Structures are given as structure tokens and as C-alpha cells.
Amino acid sequence: MTVASAPDSEALDKEAPLRRDIRLLGRILGDTIRSQEGHSVFELVEIVRKTAIRFHRGEEIARSELTEVLAGLSCEGMIPIIRAFSYFSHLANTAEDQHHIRRARLHAIAGSAPRDGTLMLALQRTHKAGIGLAALKEFFTTALICPVLTAHPTEVQRKSTLDREREVATLLAERDRSTSTPEEEVEIDSALRRAILTLWQTSILRRNRLKVIEEVTNGLSYYDYTFLTELPRIYELCQGALATFDPALKDYELPSFFRAEPLRYQFLSRGAPCSGS
């Protein structure tokens, strides 16, 4: 699949890397569909895509053309079309997530003013509001974050699918950040092609209902690259920001304000020592 170029303007220039990534992923997905399903299926996907774009841009005749194309498909013939657009949407969302990370890094590298939602901006606002050191310490001493994690009743994505999407995200980040040799760029693009091929060969829906313990195990499997990696980073960022806010807090040991029984269960399931906190 390919993506139509967006209008070029100064206001959209910062979105150029996002458009580049989406075009890359769309091109790889299109190549995958052509190699796995045949040229005729690829051409049908392209017809639907281009006609849908025309309809979105206000060409009313495209509506009847699109209806005619889709109405002529059997249920079996519709499946690769649905899968193509579903996976393209997933890949585009992955690229957009990476773009948000990219923009945040660029702001940090440029030394931009703290942005909404950051700890540093919150501390600046507390300082302007006249909140002193004692009040800050009291806040962190009594603060409590206790997430409640549940299996979403409409979440149907398989772990294998989510794992491949995470792999694509990692490869996009590597492609974006590293100064690569031509050979290394080829390796990254080849890895992207393998990940997207695996994604295409993976059924979108589970054929069997998960047991409760399987849902729990699946949920805990994501802790390695969410809570267990990000929590130490968050505490370090908090302590660094507090020291910047007030030098008297340089040696301040931030209290443990994050509690979660699922985290404790994850440690215990590995045989790791874990306190009640």
C-alpha cells in the first residue's frame, strides 16, 4: 500500500518524518501483500484505497464506484482487503506513536521550555504558586499511585500481533536515531520487512477464547518493557527535576509512592525477593 503525499508547507514540515515512515511501512505492506496474496489482490487493495481517497476528498462519484467494487466481492474475497487496511492502520498508528517520541526528544535536545504534561513544568508552576520545599516533601511522602489493570472486554489483539508492532516501533526508532552505513540501513529495512511479513501471516483474531490465567500471564508479560523499565526512570527524573527546582533537594531520597499488587506478583512469579511496598 502507498500513501498520497500531503501538501508541503512550513506548518507541516515537522510532520515530514511521520509521512516518510508511513510511506515506508505502506510500501513494505504493499510488497508483502503482492508476494503473499498475488498481484490481483494487491491491485484490488490499491483500487479500493485510491477510490476511498477520492471519496474522502469530495468526489461523489467515487462513492458509487467504491460501493460497486466492494459489493462485487465475496466474503472470502473481502478478507484480504479488510486485513490490508486493518494492518495499515496499525502500522500507521505505530509510526505516529514513534513520531510523538521523536518530537519530544527533539524538544529536549533543543532545550525547549518544559511542555504541558511534564514534571518540570509542574514544578515551575508550583514554584510560581509559592509552594515551598516542605509542602513538596509532604506531597511526595503522602502521594500514592496505585494503578488498576484490567483486561479490556473489547481488546482482541493477540500478543503475537502486539509483539510484532513493538518490533516495528523499535526498528523505526533505530532507523531514525542512528547514523547508519548503507549496509546497516539495508539490514534495518530487511528486519522491517520480516516483521511486517510475520504480521501479515498472523491471524488478526484468536480462534480460541483465552482462560483467565492466560489473560493475566499475557498482561504481566508486558511489564518488562513498561512498568519494570519505566518506573526507575520516572523516579530518577523526579529526583533530578526536584534537584533542579531546589538545590536543597539534591540528596533528597524520593519516597516510594507507586504501589501495585500486580507488580509484586510479577516479581514473585520469577522468584525474586519483593517487599510488601
Model segments located where?
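Often metal-dependent polyanion-binding catalytic scaffolds in large enzymes
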Residues: 1-277
